[in-house]
Amino acid sequence: MFPRDARLDMYDPELAKAIAAEVRRQEDHVELIASENYCSTLVMQVQGSQLTNKYAEGYSGKRYYGGCEYVDIAEQLAIERAKKLFGADYANVQPHSGSQANQAVYFALLQPGDTILGMSLAHGGHLTHGANVNVSGKLFNAVQYGVNAQGLIDYEAVESLALEHRPKMVVAGFSAYSQKIDWARFRAIADQVGAYLLVDMAHVAGLVAAGVYPSPLPHAHVVTSTTHKTLRGPRGGIIVAQAPQEALVKKLQSIVFPGIQGGPLMHVIAAKAVAFKEALEPAFKVYQQQVVKNAKAMAGTLMLRGYKIVSGGTENHLMLVDMIGRDVSGKDAEGALGQVHITVNKNAVPDDPRSPFVTSGLRLGTPAVTTRGYQEQDCVDLAHWIADVLDAPADVTVIAAVREKVAAQCKKYPVYR
């Protein structure tokens, strides 16, 4: 019925052309978006397998459909590997995304109208931590904390807000914060007011797995994550916990299915299993150590060139460049760097006077370039080229020269050999 040698370029040339162009873009452009990475060919192979055909509502051994004996194996492998990777006693690998993992925890442990205390999006948090444009800020009474003048989380202010508002849940985690978080301090604050502590470690999950960033699992009631970003797996979500009470496990299991999702994506769950196996390899720790080394090299070079990094540096995979007071906006910078084939994203910075669609900042991250094989000197060079462009975004001579250097660097480090 379906020939294995069918060619997409023959059947749907328009789509095939777009995919081929994206493949070329990934090879020919430097990827510095902190939330992006390249997954392995094995992960892609599994995600494109016949497992996509199988419906498997429920959990391993307790399905609502027959014929699930083999996908049960795949899901159980993902669960056991996730538990081993993070030192967890519980893992749910069915969430379709990190946002849905967060949503599941909210719905499992909260009632509409309950108060949550999360990090402000404008100060480095995530949409799902209570932003008013997100369901987390619409269904719940969201109180937001931020960073101090040094760009660091103000734990005293977090504690004061918790004592004032008595949240049912404290949310820790970020999408644009470059320092280590004191998970124990967050748990102490949550305990003071009898709140749950949810940690969203989506950005640093790979670093946590490799032991190069503090693990939140000993401190949080529940931890969520994406499975891509620094974990380098397929796009998806996960919920893990260490020594959870049985009542909590039951709530989480029942809210993921049937509470907010139906059939799990078995091809994605199997791909998660592959990614977790890869993350358990010794080489993964070496990779994550290099991610941080590269980020430090890049941030240090940008600061030497006169660019401000929020919080004064980085202890993880990302950095936030603060361009308040400069003529070039985040939007302008993103466009100028795009011309030289360096892909970044504009990002709001604390106390940003510009709109979220323009911004005064850039978020940069090193997971993807480190996957390509970049070392510290490569990232020093890259940071100088970024500064060259930001110093003269309209100078066609600079743009042409940097684009040529980027092309040579990309050729030196292909993604898929």
From Swiss-Prot:
Residues under site feature: Plays an important role in substrate specificity: 228
Keywords: Amino-acid biosynthesis, Cytoplasm, One-carbon metabolism, Pyridoxal phosphate, Transferase
Amino acids binding (6S)-5,6,7,8-tetrahydrofolate: 121, 125-127, 355-357
GO BP terms in the entry: glycine biosynthetic process from serine; tetrahydrofolate interconversion
CDD domains: SHMT
PROSITE patterns named in the record: SHMT
Major localization listed first in the record, in broad terms: cytoplasm
Catalytic activity: (6R)-5,10-methylene-5,6,7,8-tetrahydrofolate + glycine + H2O = (6S)-5,6,7,8-tetrahydrofolate + L-serine
Domain of life: Bacteria
One term of GO molecular function: pyridoxal phosphate binding
PANTHER family reported for this sequence: SERINE HYDROXYMETHYLTRANSFERASE
Homology family: Belongs to the SHMT family.
Protein purpose: Catalyzes the reversible interconversion of serine and glycine with tetrahydrofolate (THF) serving as the one-carbon carrier. This reaction serves as the major source of one-carbon groups required for the biosynthesis of purines, thymidylate, methionine, and other important biomolecules. Also exhibits THF-independent aldolase activity toward beta-hydroxyamino acids, producing glycine and aldehydes, via a retro-aldol mechanism.
Self-association and partners: Homodimer.
Protein name: Serine hydroxymethyltransferase
Species for this entry: Xylella fastidiosa (strain Temecula1 / ATCC 700964)
Gene: glyA
